[in-house]
């Protein structure tokens, strides 16, 4: 088989900071003509976006795709809800998980795979404030340990 040609367009950096990521899914996304042109230009924002399961289908909300520059009056609505394409078994699994308290569907990134737009969707559980503080403290401690090792290796 051929190589998968992947180009990351946008990442949701806040998602990994605000949530514990439990599982990730790759899903397709239904876009209109001017939307895919804007995505290819990299004019996408995933910051406050989330996904919900409605009537056995998964929809992505608050993903902002800027209007296409050369678009005319048929340009798309930047904040509309967009349908995600997942296998039926994955959707059933997500329905069960998202009904549990604290679980959400959060997009981690949008990318082009063989010229098709894909969303990396995560089943995530929200972090509390103290969880975020612990993670920041752990990262700074690891950074200081690496710095100390680097200093010792110099001499």
From Swiss-Prot:
Q: What does this protein do?
A: Required for rescue of stalled ribosomes mediated by trans-translation. Binds to transfer-messenger RNA (tmRNA), required for stable association of tmRNA with ribosomes. tmRNA and SmpB together mimic tRNA shape, replacing the anticodon stem-loop with SmpB. tmRNA is encoded by the ssrA gene; the 2 termini fold to resemble tRNA(Ala) and it encodes a 'tag peptide', a short internal open reading frame. During trans-translation Ala-aminoacylated tmRNA acts like a tRNA, entering the A-site of stalled ribosomes, displacing the stalled mRNA.
- Highest taxon, organism lineage: Bacteria
Q: Which GO terms describe its biological process?
A: trans-translation
Instruction: Give a single Pfam family match.
Output: SmpB
**What is the predominant subcellular site recorded for this chain?**
cytoplasm
Q: Name one GO cellular component term.
A: cytosol
Q: What is the protein name stated in its UniProt record? A: SsrA-binding protein
* Source organism of this protein record: Halothermothrix orenii (strain H 168 / OCM 544 / DSM 9562)
Among Gene3D superfamilies, the record links this protein to: 2.40.280.10
* Organism lineage: Bacteria, Bacillati, Bacillota, Clostridia, Halanaerobiales
Query: A GO molecular function for this record?
Result: RNA binding
UniProt signal peptide: none
Q: Which UniProt keywords apply?
A: Cytoplasm, RNA-binding
Record PROSITE patterns? SSRP
Member of which family? Belongs to the SmpB family.
> Does the UniProt entry include the keyword Protein transport?
no
Q: Where in the cell is it found?
A: Cytoplasm
